[in-house]
């Protein structure tokens, strides 16, 4: 009898542990996981490569990512107010063909190709855009059809680079027009933004937006709060643009790694580096 009772007790304990383990396993993991990888264009890995070879390179990358369990790909399609797709508003990217405005030969649409290949592998496709950046070096030549040539007043030079002025409604409207074009014509799963903040600061040089602040800064006692507001407005407008077109399409943002240092804010991190809030004018906690 004692042996029988002992066996029943052991069986009950094993069953209880199994149920508990199942509960812990289920509760510790979300229903859906986001396991993403970035594929960038600005390192020159695509430039000037023949179409068939580049397609095979991308297929090999996707196969490798699929084998690693990746379920979403964030693919750079607009690095410098240009396009790695058949844009209605901006020129072909130099990071694809070597010359801005030059279409690929033989013709193909890298974004459409990547959407189809990602979906074949049950991966999400996130169209990655850089909103403000136009030139990483003033030596870089712009295509004759680039929007800068029609509206140079929308842009500012900071250091050796060219940017959309984040304060201007015209800048935001153009960026949203580009996103409208992408979301309307392509089966993207998400729009993803990188470098959505003001440019990284250059020592001894303030971002040249005094004229814009004089025109649009009413109601703000200091320029820093106004700049953060400009970034917030763009984020809100893009969110509304995407949701208004296809509510199921996601919208994501990649901020810089430090919100604020604890030396600036108790809510900050134990870091001592560049800060989103103070240096890049992005309030990432909103």
Regions found by a protein language model. Name each.
Residues 1-8:
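Bacterial N-terminal signal peptides that target proteins for export
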Residues 170-286:
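Active-site neighborhood of glycoside hydrolase catalytic domains
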Residues 42-52, 92-108, 157-176, 218-231, ...:
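The substrate-binding groove and active-site-proximal loops of carbohydrate-active enzymes
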Residues 32-34, 40, 44-56, 116, ...:
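Active-site-adjacent "subsite" loops/lids of carbohydrate-active enzymes
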Residues 56-83, 185-190:
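Catalytic domains of carbohydrate-active enzymes, especially glycoside hydrolases
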Residues 83-98, 133-159, 195-219, 266-274:
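Aromatic- and acidic-residue-enriched segments that line the glycan-binding/catalytic groove
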Residues 32, 36, 70-81, 109-156, ...:
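Glycine-rich, aromatic-flanked loop segments that form ligand/cofactor-binding clefts
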Residues 11-20:
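Hydrophobic h-region of N-terminal signal peptides that target proteins for export
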